């Protein structure tokens, strides 16, 4: 398994990295502002209203996160009962409730060159693999080796990995099993 300490340490690094990226404007060209209408509830009165809001940054970063604060959080509870063993997953090392979307433009290299578009990467293929429902989030452990084998690649051939940092336990487990440093 993945220890609580490792999960909390990873979560701290993730929060710090996101905070630094936001502070330094690293994501400004990656996030397109989106204006929507949002229901807002006044906590004191319960009054609901619809207000316009523009989302222009990831709102889920907690830049003031500390390791001491993470270690002080209690394991997640569900209906008053600990989930499974309930020892390690907390609000600090697990995903928050959030909405999001993404898009990716894929085109032929010749078309990109003709249009003076500099590719950010190469799409080599994809693979899918299943796992048990209670093993949510560890699909890469099964799919990545298939994909690498199909293309004659090794983990060390990949410059940048995205394993979804929603849950520290999940990303650390996947990285450990796949041998991603």
Model-predicted segments: where are they?
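N-terminal extracellular/periplasmic Venus flytrap/periplasmic-binding protein-like
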Residues: 9-114, 179-181
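Short glycine/threonine-rich loop-to-helix capping motif typified by GTGT followed
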Residues: 26, 41-46, 133-140, 165-181
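Buried hydrophobic packing segments
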Residues: 18, 103-108, 140-147, 171-174
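Flexible glycine-/small-residue-enriched beta->alpha junction loops
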Residues: 1
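Active-site pocket-shaping loop/turn-to-helix segments
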Residues: 5-11, 86-102, 124-150, 159-165
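Short helix-loop-beta-strand segments that form the rim/entrance of peptidase-like active sites
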Residues: 118-124
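Phosphate/pyrophosphate-binding loops at sites that engage ATP/ADP/AMP, CoA/4′-phosphopantetheine
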Residues: 112-116, 145-160, 178-179
